[in-house]
A protein has these predicted regions:
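N-acyltransferase acceptor-side catalytic subdomain
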Residues: 1-170
Length: 170
Protein backbone atom coordinates (compact mmCIF):
# COMPACT_ATOMS: atom_id res chain seq x y z
CA UNK A 1 0.00 0.00 0.00
CA UNK A 2 1.37 3.41 -0.95
CA UNK A 3 0.58 6.31 1.39
CA UNK A 4 0.63 9.97 0.41
CA UNK A 5 0.35 13.13 2.49
CA UNK A 6 -1.81 15.95 1.10
CA UNK A 7 -1.34 19.43 2.53
CA UNK A 8 -3.81 21.22 0.21
CA UNK A 9 -7.31 20.38 -0.96
CA UNK A 10 -6.22 21.26 -4.49
CA UNK A 11 -4.10 18.09 -4.53
CA UNK A 12 -7.18 16.13 -3.42
CA UNK A 13 -9.61 17.53 -6.04
CA UNK A 14 -8.85 14.73 -8.55
CA UNK A 15 -9.92 12.23 -5.86
CA UNK A 16 -13.23 13.94 -4.99
CA UNK A 17 -15.45 11.46 -6.83
CA UNK A 18 -13.48 8.40 -5.66
CA UNK A 19 -13.59 9.83 -2.10
CA UNK A 20 -17.39 10.03 -2.07
CA UNK A 21 -17.76 6.68 -3.87
CA UNK A 22 -15.58 5.03 -1.23
CA UNK A 23 -17.55 6.75 1.53
CA UNK A 24 -20.68 4.89 0.39
CA UNK A 25 -18.84 1.60 1.11
CA UNK A 26 -16.93 2.83 4.14
CA UNK A 27 -17.07 1.73 7.77
CA UNK A 28 -18.92 5.00 8.50
CA UNK A 29 -21.01 6.68 5.81
CA UNK A 30 -21.90 10.06 7.28
CA UNK A 31 -22.58 13.39 5.54
CA UNK A 32 -19.83 14.97 7.65
CA UNK A 33 -17.27 12.89 5.74
CA UNK A 34 -18.23 13.93 2.20
CA UNK A 35 -15.46 15.57 0.21
CA UNK A 36 -17.25 18.89 -0.32
CA UNK A 37 -18.30 19.15 3.31
CA UNK A 38 -14.77 18.61 4.64
CA UNK A 39 -13.26 20.89 1.99
CA UNK A 40 -15.64 23.67 3.00
CA UNK A 41 -15.06 22.96 6.70
CA UNK A 42 -11.31 23.27 6.09
CA UNK A 43 -11.68 26.58 4.23
CA UNK A 44 -13.15 28.11 7.39
CA UNK A 45 -10.89 26.13 9.75
CA UNK A 46 -13.95 24.78 11.49
CA UNK A 47 -15.63 28.16 11.73
CA UNK A 48 -12.45 29.56 13.25
CA UNK A 49 -12.09 26.84 15.88
CA UNK A 50 -8.59 25.91 14.61
CA UNK A 51 -6.81 29.10 13.43
CA UNK A 52 -3.31 27.55 13.61
CA UNK A 53 -4.03 24.30 11.78
CA UNK A 54 -2.28 22.58 8.88
CA UNK A 55 -3.95 20.11 6.53
CA UNK A 56 -2.57 16.55 6.73
CA UNK A 57 -4.90 14.27 4.76
CA UNK A 58 -3.36 10.87 4.08
CA UNK A 59 -4.50 8.66 1.22
CA UNK A 60 -3.53 5.08 0.50
CA UNK A 61 -3.51 3.45 -2.92
CA UNK A 62 -2.78 -0.04 -4.07
CA UNK A 63 -2.35 -0.77 -7.79
CA UNK A 64 -3.88 2.66 -8.55
CA UNK A 65 -7.00 1.85 -6.50
CA UNK A 66 -7.93 4.06 -3.56
CA UNK A 67 -7.83 1.94 -0.39
CA UNK A 68 -8.31 4.46 2.40
CA UNK A 69 -8.41 8.10 3.42
CA UNK A 70 -7.41 9.55 6.77
CA UNK A 71 -8.95 13.06 6.71
CA UNK A 72 -6.60 14.69 9.21
CA UNK A 73 -5.14 18.04 10.18
CA UNK A 74 -2.35 19.09 12.53
CA UNK A 75 -2.98 21.49 15.41
CA UNK A 76 -2.31 21.95 19.08
CA UNK A 77 -5.11 20.08 20.84
CA UNK A 78 -7.08 21.16 23.91
CA UNK A 79 -4.39 19.62 26.15
CA UNK A 80 -1.69 21.77 24.54
CA UNK A 81 -0.11 18.86 22.63
CA UNK A 82 0.72 18.82 18.92
CA UNK A 83 -1.89 16.43 17.55
CA UNK A 84 -3.42 14.95 14.45
CA UNK A 85 -7.18 15.45 14.51
CA UNK A 86 -9.98 14.38 12.19
CA UNK A 87 -11.19 17.08 9.82
CA UNK A 88 -14.50 18.34 11.16
CA UNK A 89 -13.40 18.21 14.81
CA UNK A 90 -14.70 19.18 17.39
CA UNK A 91 -17.75 21.42 17.69
CA UNK A 92 -19.09 21.55 14.12
CA UNK A 93 -19.40 17.95 12.94
CA UNK A 94 -20.68 14.69 14.38
CA UNK A 95 -19.77 11.19 13.25
CA UNK A 96 -16.24 11.51 11.90
CA UNK A 97 -14.04 8.55 10.99
CA UNK A 98 -11.51 7.16 8.59
CA UNK A 99 -12.82 6.46 5.10
CA UNK A 100 -12.03 2.84 4.34
CA UNK A 101 -13.91 -0.34 3.47
CA UNK A 102 -14.38 -2.77 6.39
CA UNK A 103 -12.17 -5.43 4.78
CA UNK A 104 -9.25 -2.98 4.49
CA UNK A 105 -9.50 -1.30 7.91
CA UNK A 106 -6.89 -3.27 9.88
CA UNK A 107 -4.15 -3.09 7.26
CA UNK A 108 -4.98 0.54 6.48
CA UNK A 109 -4.61 1.56 10.14
CA UNK A 110 -1.38 -0.40 10.48
CA UNK A 111 0.11 1.21 7.38
CA UNK A 112 -1.24 4.63 8.33
CA UNK A 113 0.38 4.56 11.77
CA UNK A 114 3.68 3.41 10.23
CA UNK A 115 3.45 6.25 7.71
CA UNK A 116 2.59 8.90 10.30
CA UNK A 117 5.37 7.76 12.64
CA UNK A 118 7.98 7.83 9.88
CA UNK A 119 6.81 10.77 7.74
CA UNK A 120 5.59 13.21 10.39
CA UNK A 121 7.47 12.14 13.54
CA UNK A 122 7.96 15.64 14.98
CA UNK A 123 4.55 17.03 14.03
CA UNK A 124 2.38 15.20 16.53
CA UNK A 125 2.35 13.57 19.95
CA UNK A 126 -1.31 12.49 19.97
CA UNK A 127 -3.99 11.22 17.65
CA UNK A 128 -6.93 13.15 19.04
CA UNK A 129 -9.81 11.60 17.12
CA UNK A 130 -13.08 12.86 18.54
CA UNK A 131 -16.59 12.32 17.22
CA UNK A 132 -15.97 8.72 16.19
CA UNK A 133 -19.26 6.81 16.32
CA UNK A 134 -19.41 4.54 19.34
CA UNK A 135 -19.94 1.52 17.08
CA UNK A 136 -17.07 2.39 14.72
CA UNK A 137 -14.69 -0.52 14.12
CA UNK A 138 -11.91 2.07 14.00
CA UNK A 139 -11.89 2.17 17.80
CA UNK A 140 -11.08 -1.53 18.26
CA UNK A 141 -8.61 -1.59 15.35
CA UNK A 142 -6.81 1.50 16.60
CA UNK A 143 -6.66 0.17 20.16
CA UNK A 144 -5.21 -3.16 18.98
CA UNK A 145 -2.60 -1.53 16.74
CA UNK A 146 -1.48 1.09 19.26
CA UNK A 147 -1.27 -1.58 21.98
CA UNK A 148 0.97 -3.71 19.76
CA UNK A 149 3.24 -0.67 19.35
CA UNK A 150 3.36 0.02 23.08
CA UNK A 151 1.52 3.33 22.61
CA UNK A 152 -1.08 4.62 25.04
CA UNK A 153 -4.72 4.38 23.96
CA UNK A 154 -7.42 6.32 25.79
CA UNK A 155 -11.11 6.18 24.99
CA UNK A 156 -13.60 8.64 26.44
CA UNK A 157 -17.13 9.72 25.70
CA UNK A 158 -17.21 13.35 24.64
CA UNK A 159 -20.57 15.06 24.19
CA UNK A 160 -22.42 12.28 22.37
CA UNK A 161 -24.79 13.37 19.63
CA UNK A 162 -28.44 12.56 20.29
CA UNK A 163 -30.18 10.15 17.96
CA UNK A 164 -33.42 8.26 17.63
CA UNK A 165 -33.39 4.73 16.27
CA UNK A 166 -36.10 4.43 13.62
CA UNK A 167 -37.75 1.21 12.52
CA UNK A 168 -36.64 -0.19 9.16
CA UNK A 169 -40.03 0.62 7.60
CA UNK A 170 -39.96 4.31 8.60
Amino acid sequence: MEFKLHTTFESLEPLARAWDDMLAESITDAPFLRFNYLRDWWQTLGGGEWPQAELAVVTAHEADALIGIAPLFQAVNQDGLPALLLLGSIEISDYLDLIVRPADLTRFINGLLDFLASSLPDSWRALDWVNLPEASPTLAALEADTSARGWTFTRETYQPAPYIALPADF
